[in-house]
Design a protein with these regions (language model features):
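OB-fold and OB-like single-stranded nucleic-acid-recognition modules
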Residues: 1-105
Length: 105
C-alpha cells in the first residue's frame, strides 16, 4: 500500500488507525499463510521468520499483514478484526503487522 505523508519511526498503532476506516469491515483474501523466510548473510535459510496474509477494506487497495506466529485464517472474504495491528511507513510504502486476528460474525 502506498501512502503520501512522510513519517519517521517504526511500527505504530496510531498510523494503522489513521489508514483504516473503523466503520467499514476488513475482509480476508488469503486462503493460506505465506511463510517469510529468514535470511543470513544475504542467503535464505530454511527458518520461517513470519507469516503473511492478504486483506482488503472498501476504499483501500489490498494489503498484506505480517504475523510472527502461525494464525488460523478464516474462509475467503470473511470479515476479520486484528489484535494489535500496527503500521510502518518506509519510502512511502506502508507495511502492517499484527499479533493475531479473529473472524467477526
Amino acid at each position: 500500500m502506498k501512502f503520501n505523508n512522510k513519517r519517521s519511526g517504526g511500527y505504530s498503532a496510531s498510523l494503522a488507525a489513521q489508514l483504516f476506516d473503523s466503520s467499514k469491515p476488513i475482509h480476508s483474501l488469503s486462503l493460506d499463510l505465506e511463510p517469510q523466510m529468514k535470511f543470513e548473510d544475504g542467503k535464505r535459510t530454511d527458518e520461517v521468520q513470519a507469516y503473511k496474509a492478504w486483506f482488503t477494506q472498501a476504499g483501500l487497495p489490498p494489503f498484506e499483514v505480517k504475523f510472527e506466529t502461525k494464525v488460523a485464517l478464516p474462509a475467503y472474504l470473511s470479515v476479520v478484526e486484528f489484535d494489535n495491528i500496527e503500521a510502518c511507513e518506509v519510502s512511502y510504502n506502508v507495511y502492517f503487522r499484527a499479533v493475531d486476528l479473529k473472524e467477526v460474525n
